From Swiss-Prot:
UniProt function note: Participates actively in the response to hyperosmotic and heat shock by preventing the aggregation of stress-denatured proteins and by disaggregating proteins, also in an autonomous, DnaK-independent fashion. Unfolded proteins bind initially to DnaJ; upon interaction with the DnaJ-bound protein, DnaK hydrolyzes its bound ATP, resulting in the formation of a stable complex. GrpE releases ADP from DnaK; ATP binding to DnaK triggers the release of the substrate protein, thus completing the reaction cycle.
Species classification: Bacteria, Pseudomonadati, Spirochaetota, Spirochaetia, Spirochaetales
Pfam families with a match to the protein in the record: DnaJ (PF00226), DnaJ_C (PF01556), DnaJ_CXXCXGXG (PF00684)
GO cellular component, one term: cytoplasm
Protein name: Chaperone protein DnaJ
Induction: By heat shock.
Residues binding Zn(2+) 1: 148, 151, 201, 204
Start-end of CR-type zinc fingers: 135-213
Known cofactor(s): Zn(2+)
């Protein structure tokens, strides 16, 4: 016994056209064969819903169905279509957004897959701040899909050729359904290829590519920053269909440095100084990230956590000949373990500076 068309769409008798369209749309999206390839139950549900929609969306056929049920269309097929394909047209006009994606989208995906380059790959490498300053060359080992040496991506044994798929006649697409409603789907036999590999290559088992390890020289330019990527063209996986390789993206991870902290092109470092150096000022020598010894001037009367700017002693600016700055942050060291002479000196200094017993917090 055939199912009631209203029941198939989850509707009650007397449903409006809008309700019929909404109900069918919901089922079509969920059970369309291209979204459920190989699922016979989904294909059956989709077919039933489509038949129900064809009848209920057409006023004449709906009236006949409401009066006579399924018997109205037995024997003579879908009579009533002779007056025009209004119900059928409605399907494509009202649900063009669904069916366009099924009918043309998959074709486009197959076409794009055959013409697209291979898959891109990612690789992370950790380097020191010094490596980032000077630049760095290193060999890295990657695993990727490369063109099969035996079949050169053709997927068949040497001396043999693929045969045309007899299910889709080489188109990669098959038409399902009958009557006035047909659905085009990816061929389940050749999976959209349009051909069958009768004698697959023994080396790659018909894939057209092999997994291989390769050693690649990586050149990291001076000034590279943390989390930046280097693109290595053609060092990704191969697409055997067109023999084009994807790219390799190497992500740079820079280790923390025990002295220097980086902020873009600039470097920051703490500068430990004594009370006397802070009070009187002094010229001192320091070493930069480049291990270069330079003289800097500590101005007299400098306070704790004040900054001293050293121009062009920061990081190289990528792909230029310019440099960032080095910013030194003073850290005045409090002397400990004083001997008797040092204690007397500080006591006398305190008297000279009139250090009192009271401190005004408002002057802090």
């Amino acid at each position: 016994m055939k199912k009631d068309y209203y029941e198939i769409l989850g509707l009650s008798k007397g449903a409006s056209k809008d309700e019929i369209k909404k109900a069918y749309r919901k089922i079509a999206i969920k059970y369309h064969p291209d979204r459920n390839q190989g699922n016979e139950e989904a294909a059956s549900i989709f077919k039933e819903a489509t038949q129900a929609y064809e009848i209920l969306i057409d006023d004449n056929k709906k009236a006949k169905y409401d009066r006579f049920g399924h018997s109205a269309f037995e024997g003579g097929g879908f009579e009533g279509f002779s007056g025009g394909f209004s119900g059928f047209s409605d399907i494509f006009e009202d649900f063009g957004d669904i069916f366009d994606s099924f009918f043309t989208g998959n074709k486009g995906q197959e076409r794009n897959r055959k013409h697209a380059k291979g898959e891109d790959l990612g690789y992370n490498i950790e380097i020191s701040l010094e490596n980032a300053y000077f630049g760095y060359k290193n060999n890295i080992n990657i695993t990727r899909q490369m063109l099969c040496d035996s079949c050169l991506g053709k997927k068949s044994e040497k001396g043999t050729s693929p045969s045309i798929c007899n299910m889709c006649n080489g188109s990669g697409r098959v038409v399902q359904g009958g009557g006035f409603f047909r659905v085009t789907t990816t061929c389940s036999k050749c999976y959209g290829e349009g051909k069958i590999i009768s004698n697959p290559c023994k080396s790659c088992k018909g894939k057209g590519s092999l997994t291989k390890q390769e050693t690649i020289q990586l050149n990291i330019p001076p000034g590279i920053d943390n989390n930046q990527q280097i693109k290595m063209k053609g060092k990704g996986n191969v697409n055997p269909d067109n023999q084009e390789y994807g790219d390799l993206y190497v992500k740079i991870l820079i280790r923390s440095h025990k002295v220097f902290k980086r902020n873009g092109k600039d470097l920051y470092a703490m500068l430990p100084i004594s009370f006397t150096q802070a009070a009187l000022g002094k010229e001192v020598k320091i070493k930069t990230i480049a291990s270069k010894e330079i003289k800097i001037h500590i101005p007299k009367g400098i306070n704790n956590e004040e900054q001293i700017l050293i121009k062009n002693a920061g990081m190289p600016i990528l792909q230029t000949e310019k440099f960032g700055n080095l910013i030194l942050i003073t850290k005045i060291k409090t002397p400990k373990n004083l001997n008797s002479n040092a204690i007397k000196l500080f006591e006398n200094l305190g008297k000279e500076l009139k250090d009192g017993d009271e401190i005004d917090l408002l002057k802090a």
